[in-house]
């Protein structure tokens, strides 16, 4: 402990964009906005979007996307998209997340719900998971109160019996947490029914390094950065084997007896997180009674589908997600 009057020291520095000081103060740089602004917002004339608040106590907002071509006679499935950012960064308004949601809505002919959630280290885990539950509670409230008719003036019909959760990176971890909480029966939201989960480059961790983690850094991601995200987001004193980071850690609750809805795991073959995602899918499959599809895109890095939305691989990802949804409807 420093003496009185001693200036606080930088305990963690995350790319110069986020600093955690020794006295607990968190400093965030506005430069992150400058970085995200380098990605142009997509001008998609086929999708309407609007913002709404879903949790007033924490002032948390979400963004709704609806394809203009949607017919009032056709009920739209719901896709709840959780953005990535290592639990420390990210927002529904970041261009690549916004653009991806526009594409999800138009390609899947679905109503897309893209929420913000509390970020670490100001709000360490399980804050993000609690907010994810709040999103589904909000969705339930819309279903039972017919509030969906107020989302858009034309009163688009929404099928709450066909809800899908899609998560990117840390959002993929959130999707896993929701799948487990639903599967264990701790969340009951009838008439809202989650039919399946899509985990895209899910952010999982562990103390023992995998081969892909020991491989070369990616253009936008390094092992050091992943470790910092865990130190900043996990409860103080927790290791990467904590169950919120490692679903199969030495002290993690078993998933053997939990009934999980079908899951689709998508990962790039050159991702540092590839082996974590592959192990996750393999171990769930091995338990039996759990449907898990694993798709790996050769030579692709983390976030290839949102960072390069016009690529053939990104278009293929959308087709795979669409097929996954259609097979479960």
UniProtKB/Swiss-Prot annotation:
Annotated compartments: Nucleus; Cytoplasm, Cytosol
Pfam hit, one: Abhydrolase_3
InterPro entries in UniProt: AB_hydrolase_3, AB_hydrolase_fold, Carboxylest/Gibb_receptor
Major subcellular location class: nucleus
Catalytic activity: (-)-2'-epi-GR24 + H2O = (-)-2'-epi-GR24 ABC-rings + 5-hydroxy-3-methylfuran-2(5H)-one; 5-deoxystrigol + H2O = 5-deoxystrigol ABC-rings + 5-hydroxy-3-methylfuran-2(5H)-one; orobanchol + H2O = orobanchol ABC-rings + 5-hydroxy-3-methylfuran-2(5H)-one
Matches recorded under SUPFAM superfamilies: alpha/beta-Hydrolases
Active site: 169, 271, 302
EC number: 3.1.1.-
Sites where the protein binds (-)-2'-epi-GR24: 85-86, 169-170
GO biological process: regulation of secondary shoot formation; strigolactone metabolic process
Function (record text): Binds to strigolactones (SLs) such as (-)-2'-epi-GR24(4DO), 5-deoxystrigol (5DS) and orobanchol, and catalyzes their hydrolysis; SL are phytohormones controlling shoot branching and communications between plants and microorganisms. Promotes shoot branching by dampening SL-inhibited axillary bud outgrowth.
Protein name according to UniProt: Strigolactones hydrolase CXE15
């Amino acid at each position: 402990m420093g003496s009185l009057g001693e200036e606080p020291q930088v305990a963690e520095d995350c790319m110069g964009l986020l600093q955690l000081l020794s006295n607990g103060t968190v400093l965030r740089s506005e430069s992150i906005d400058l970085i995200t602004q380098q990605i142009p917002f997509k001008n998609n004339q086929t999708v309407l979007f609007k913002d709404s608040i879903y949790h007033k106590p924490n002032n948390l907002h979400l963004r709704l996307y609806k394809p203009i071509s949607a017919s009032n006679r056709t009920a739209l499935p719901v896709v709840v998209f959780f953005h990535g950012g290592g639990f420390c960064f990210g927002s529904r308004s970041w261009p690549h997340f916004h653009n991806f949601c526009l594409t999800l809505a138009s390609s899947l002919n679905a109503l897309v719900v893209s929420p913000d959630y509390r970020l670490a280290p100001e709000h360490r885990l399980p804050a993000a998971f609690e907010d994810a539950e709040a999103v589904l509670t909000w969705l339930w409230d819309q279903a039972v109160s017919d509030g969906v008719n107020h989302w858009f003036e034309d009163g688009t019909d929404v099928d709450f019996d066909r809800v899908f959760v899609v998560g990117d990176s840390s959002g993929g971890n959130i999707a896993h947490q929701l799948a487990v909480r639903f599967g264990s029966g701790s969340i009951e939201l009838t008439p809202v029914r989650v039919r399946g989960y899509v985990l895209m480059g899910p952010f999982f961790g562990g103390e023992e390094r995998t081969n892909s983690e020991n491989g070369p850094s990616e253009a936008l991601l390094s092992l050091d950065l992943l470790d910092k995200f865990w130190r900043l987001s996990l409860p103080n004193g927790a290791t990467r084997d904590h169950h919120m980071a490692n679903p199969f850690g030495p002290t993690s609750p078993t998933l053997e007896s939990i009934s999980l809805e079908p899951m689709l795991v998508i990962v790039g073959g050159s991702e540092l997180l590839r082996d974590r995602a592959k192990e996750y899918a393999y171990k769930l499959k091995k338990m039996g009674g759990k449907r898990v599809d694993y798709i790996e895109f050769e030579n692709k890095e983390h976030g290839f589908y949102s960072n390069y939305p016009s690529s053939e691989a990104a278009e293929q990802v959308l087709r795979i997600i669409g097929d996954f949804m259609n097979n479960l409807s």
